[in-house]
Amino acid sequence: MSKKKFIDKEISKYVLRRDYSKIEKNFNEPNLLNLQKNAFHKFIDTELEGTIKSIFPIKSIGGRYSLEYIGMKLEKPKRSEKEARNEGKTYDRPLYVDLAIVDNESGEVKKTTKSSKNKASNTDGIFFASIPMITEKGTFIVNGIEKFVISQIVRSPGAYILTKSQIKLSNSRKRIQEGYICEILPAKGTLFFIFMAENKDFIQVMFRDAIGESTHTIPITAFLKALGLNKEEILNIFANHKSIKNSLDNEIYNEKDVFETDELINLRKNLNSSDSNRSYGVDTKLRELFKKYSSLKSQLEAEGKNAEKQKELNEVINNIISEKAAKDLVINLSISTKNIDSKFRLSNKETTYQSIIYNHFFSNKSFDLSKAGRFKMARKMRLSERLYQRVLAEDLKDINGKVVIKKNTLIQKHELDTIKQLTKEGKLGIVHNVNLDERISKMANVVKYEKINVYQDNDSQDEFIPIIGTDTSLDKPTLSISDILSITSYVINLDYDIGFYDDIDHLGNKRLKLIDELLKTRAQAGLVRIEKFINDKLAIADGANKSQEQSEEQEPKKSLTVKSIINTKPFQISFKEFFNSHQLTQFLDQQNPLAELTNKRRISAMGPGGISREDPNLDIRDVHYSHYGKICPIETPEGMNIGLIMSLATYASTDENGFLITPYRIVKNGVITDEIRWLTALSEDEYIIACSNLNVEKNKFKEDKVLCRYRSSWEFFDVKDVDFIDISPKQVVSIAASSIPFLENDDANRALMGANMQRQATPLISPIAPIVGTGNEYKIAHDSGMAAVYDGEKDGTVSYVDGGTIKIKSGSEEKVYELTKFNKSNQNTCNNQVPIVSVGEKVTKGTTIADGPAMSNGELALGQNVLVAFTTWSGYNYEDAIILSKRLFMEDIFTSIHIVEYSVDCLKTKNGDEEITRDIPNVSESSKKYLDDEGIIMVGAEVKEGDVLVGKISPKGQVELTSEEKLLQAIFGDKSKNHKETSLKVPHGGEGTVAMVKRFKVEDDYELNADVIEQIKVYVVQKRKIQIGDKMAGRHGNKGIISKIVPVEDMPHLEDGTTIDIMLNPLGVPSRMNIGQILELHLGLAMKKLTLSKVLELYYDKKPASDFSLWFGIHEEASRNLIKNLEKILNEKQIKSLDQANKEFTDFDLSLALSRSGISREKLIYKTATPVFEGVNRTDLKEAMTEAGIDPINGKLGEGKSGKFNLIDGRTGEYFDGEVSVGIMYMLKLDHMVDDKIHSRAVGPYSKITQQPLGGKSQNGGQRFGEMEVWALEAYGAAHNLRELLTIKSDDVKGRNNTYNAIIKGKPIPESGLPESFKLLTKQLQGLGLQVSITKELGKANNNNFKDINEYISNITNNAIKNDEDQQIIEEMDI
């Protein structure tokens, strides 16, 4: 990793950048889309079949019939991706499952056969669902719209050690617990705690009942007894610890108390009088045990002492205690006694309470830890987690009895590594078996645990305490007794400061649910409902359901077929709902390539089972040290979703358990190797990791001590202690943040805005890549999915190119690439691909062959490089406003194209069919002048608001016509009487040019929705130039609205006559602390000035045209023309050498040569790359500016001091006071355009209820004049304005109609009437029992009934107060 100033790095055939990166990267960057694509393929290839297979075979209750799984097949898609987009359909593949029904009595097997209705398929089997398929871009096409499923970040299942936790109950209630707590969180099942409360010295378990209405708490020993452990075994495992003894004292499951319970007393009484024919269900086993207990006790009393019988009696007593404890737990937790897994039954039909408990806690159907949960449980509950820095209270021996670590040894890192290694190999003699009853062993198999004794206090070393670890050989994703024992031990150990609390916000405790897991969950939900349906049908079929059993007389029975007992609708609905309405399924953001790629790498903490956006908790939203290299600390939305929506870091991926991982280079004995290892957040906590931008030479650190991170701290470590080093500085941030140059010089809040606003950049008609980039631009554009990329396995040669097609020949094969041409994106931008290869060009796999929107030569090009000055100008750039030169408007520098789709359906109605026609009633000829003979707009027509796009008439309700009327209608074609006009018209603000019309008819075999005869889609294109009110931004969070577009001649200019393009307010920089924009400004100008010297250097070095193409991104033909024109101008000026050319050949001469060659000056740029955290520093910038002839220190070259220049006002010709910072900045035009926002209302819709105008542009609504605005007018006494606003402009229905009529007839505006809101007030008063009447004139009413309130008040104050009532009135009026 040798340190250089810069290298000229070739990124592709047309892209070369001056690269200032300081670190060599021998790392193949993974494709940025692979994460979700690989997850979906994993689901389709393996998990889908496994999920479907899991519910089969399904057997009937009587056992006669069983439904067997044979196989499944995904057929080829019905339509291509392009057809699905065009027709508004889903790109999917039909899934068929082959099943067979077996009659176990007759041995008959009936398979599913191909349906006669299913002509499209050759597959035998039942149609299960059409499953949307992922495209090469990593998206799904659902109903013609591209969608994407974002990943969800959730808490991982497993065990968590906390000081406070809660169980959520129904009705938004919670049960909060504090103390030493271990929370057992399953992927499926009920969360429960094992804890020691703050004020108690024994261990308890808290469960939530199956209904979720309440919690139930019992001592841990009661739970262990319910699982089949007896008192002696419990005390032996936990070495008679006081907490366990106290737990035993606090429960009733001992011989004395259990046999005194009402249940067993009643059982003793009724034991002999029981009915032999009666079924006792689950209680049968308890009765049998009690019978055996009574019998053995009687025998012992009769025979005297008998050791064998006494032992057998003790076993029976323990079994009764266990069964009784299990029964109480089943009842208190409302656990279902049905659907018990066969492996937990003592025989095929016998069910005990213990088997119900085992089924509830140890079956993956009811309590699934998942693979990730098992990994977390094993990691947390292993012995090594708690042994570090503890002193052994016994010799640690291997399985052969050899002492490995002696007693009284303090366990350090070396000893811990030895214990981990021997445990992994199974050679350490610390494994013990739990003594369980034989019948329990059948359900639990052999239960093992690991145990080592350590001293309670390292100093005193008098008393020891056992540390119990779980069985690390377990690999099933279920809970085990071993886990319960190790958790109990952990809670006990916490009282002695043994063990660690978990940080719930640590990324090691969170995992990603990718699309495979989300789809698997949906598939399982659908299969559960299918299974229930099949069970019901099979129960009826074999006569188990007596109420529906057919009698013998009704024979012969209908033959049973697979199709008659299965309903796959629930499975189909599951997938349909997921891709249409699931919270994590979103419209793909196609604003630009960066927006699309970022959308695909987004992760959300919201969604089903996630966090609500209303949750005010800041800890879950905050940046955590474990996010390093996995989640970007910068890119997140502003507002309610901050910290809940995140972006993956540049190199982040996931492991097989869904935990986020990031790559590191391994360091061995202070030497950096090329070996890469991917680490999770939990693994990182065990290592010392160096940052990548250290002084390194020949893979060795230059210093003896280097800055490294260990967990959350940054410290200096000896190089021999370093385990790993970062791959690259940019692995900390997301792709959007890594495309901001000088990110390290920006405040994080502004960097956040910069990253977010790049995603809002509108693709321009002539995009140009940034002169100051970060080197990421090519990778982002390449992986976004918007560029056309050659994907052939072998190298090829371009054989044909035109605007819409590229053909590449590889050997005897020829691949044809149809380019996307002027398609509408989800955000209504123009998605267009342009070839960048030429015939005869060699291409390799992964080469970009065509640019998409916002791309230039395969690089991301979101905006334009413009000349920016930081200066004020007549106050027009006050408060971040932007002043623009008219050149940018005239030359279409910031012009963009937008495409809007308008759709209309021609339907079958109960009154008759709708009709597409040009003959539309009550529509003027001017509104339909561009319609063709069929009533559809012609392509190329310029349409404005209100113009008809598709003429359509719909039949009115049936009206009986006389024969004469029918004849007249037939002769004159008068459709106005029985048809109404329902044409598709251009909405408000929708004017533009018709670009394309698509027609889909049922008669042409298109699949349309029910009752749709024909569907017509019209695409209207708008060409939007930059204008006042549009929003622009840089890449550093420096945003503003265009306040003025100034003629070029009035703009300030440099001394050489170069006019400024944009003026920004200098006050927008210091307080925002985004200094990156200033550094970009200076470096950009330096690189632009260096372009001239680089052109001359290449010319005098006699470089070929291909080199010009590489350095400046222009095509070879243009390069050849440029060389010819350069030669002509140099000869005219009699310039003979490079030195002479550098002095005499000016920027104007270059512009002249470019103009003659047909090349824009903006497109000829010598670009640079300054990667984040390792790019251009202060020294590099000074050197680049000096090289370009801009002296950054003292202005000796006379053209600028510190990059500042003397500006001349274009209006007056006078110099500005002081020097101004001028340079090249990359500016973006954002999606917030004034055309989409500006709106006015004259006449429009009104609310049905309030009769007030609606609000918002979409509803052609008005601007609300609210309560406070009314107060303002009242304060000024603006009575007439108020009257107008509160009546005819609001809800005076009669008044506004009269006013409208008066205006169009040119008459004076009449008096306003009574507003609806006043009527509402009177009704509310009447509702209070007050009689309210309205009189128009005071004189016509009985004057005695009215009093002037002011007169009343003055009268009663002047006269003596006569009674308390008047006194009370005056006090209330505060007189």
Swiss-Prot record:
Enzyme Commission designation: 2.7.7.6
UniProt cross-references to PROSITE patterns, sorted A to Z: RNA_POL_BETA (PS01166)
Keyword Lipoprotein part of the UniProt annotation: no
GO terms assigned for molecular function: DNA binding; DNA-directed RNA polymerase activity; ribonucleoside binding
Keyword flag Transcription: yes
GO biological-process terms attached to the record: DNA-templated transcription
Substrates-to-products reaction catalysed: RNA(n) + a ribonucleoside 5'-triphosphate = RNA(n+1) + diphosphate
SUPFAM superfamilies: beta and beta-prime subunits of DNA dependent RNA-polymerase
Keywords: DNA-directed RNA polymerase, Nucleotidyltransferase, Transcription, Transferase
Superkingdom, taxonomy of origin: Bacteria
GO cellular component assignments: DNA-directed RNA polymerase complex
Gene3D superfamilies named in the record: 2.40.50.100, 2.40.50.150, 3.90.1100.10, DNA-directed RNA polymerase, beta subunit, external 1 domain (2.30.150.10), DNA-directed RNA polymerase, subunit 2, domain 6 (2.40.270.10), RNA polymerase alpha subunit dimerisation domain (3.90.1800.10), RNA polymerase Rpb2, domain 2 (3.90.1110.10)
Description of how the protein assembles with itself and partners: The RNAP catalytic core consists of 2 alpha, 1 beta, 1 beta' and 1 omega subunit. When a sigma factor is associated with the core the holoenzyme is formed, which can initiate transcription.
Role played: DNA-dependent RNA polymerase catalyzes the transcription of DNA into RNA using the four ribonucleoside triphosphates as substrates.
Similarity comment: family membership: Belongs to the RNA polymerase beta chain family.
Name assigned to this protein: DNA-directed RNA polymerase subunit beta
Organism: Malacoplasma penetrans (strain HF-2)
